């Protein structure tokens, strides 16, 4: 990391082509290193997202879930990704992350949807499909339950149109 800093400082000081890209990659490297350091410092009893990433079976399941948010996941399928039995996976997931796998999936989908509502003018029905909902009305109810307001209202509020 130290040599990367020196290289980036030289590139910046001499205004070499591509310096912005170098700085962006260095920022990513520092972020990953900071996360790794935090994970390494966790106690065996630690809970939360970082603790789950330290647990290889849970990390496999989270990687699959995060990578395919629109997939119609079941606890059984996530347990298969984790290479654990359904009951062992569900208990370990809830103990480590503080909620059952399907509650986590819903929360993750709503956070993804919220980001898309902020950043994209796409219709709500399309955003619903992108995060795994076939029905806009089912998505809207789930979004309101998780985020405290329906998706259309959320978009208005975050875009300053309310």
Q: Which role does the model predict for each range below?
A:
Residues 12-27, 31-71, 76-81, 95-100, ...:
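Short, Lys/Arg-enriched, Trp-marked, Pro/Gly-tolerant hinge/linker segments that flank
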Residues 60-67, 71-79, 84-85, 91-137, ...:
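Terminal helix-turn-helix DNA-binding modules in bacterial transcription factors
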Residues 140:
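DNA-recognition helix of C2H2 zinc fingers
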């Amino acid at each position: 990391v130290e040599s990367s800093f020196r290289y980036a400082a030289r590139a910046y000081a001499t205004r070499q082509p591509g310096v912005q890209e170098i700085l962006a990659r260095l920022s990513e490297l520092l972020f990953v290193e900071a996360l790794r350091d935090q994970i390494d410092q966790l106690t065996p009893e630690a809970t939360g997202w970082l603790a789950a990433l330290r647990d290889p079976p849970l990390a496999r399941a989270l990687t699959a879930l995060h990578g395919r948010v629109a997939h119609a996941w079941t606890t059984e399928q996530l347990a298969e990704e984790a290479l654990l039995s359904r009951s062992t996976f569900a208990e370990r997931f809830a103990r480590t992350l503080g909620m059952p796998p399907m509650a986590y999936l819903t929360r993750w989908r709503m956070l993804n949807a919220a980001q898309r509502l902020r950043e994209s003018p796409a219709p709500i029905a399309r955003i619903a499909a992108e995060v795994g909902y076939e029905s806009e009305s089912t998505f809207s109810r789930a979004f309101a339950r998780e985020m405290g307001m329906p998706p259309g209202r959320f978009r208005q509020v975050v875009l300053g149109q309310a």
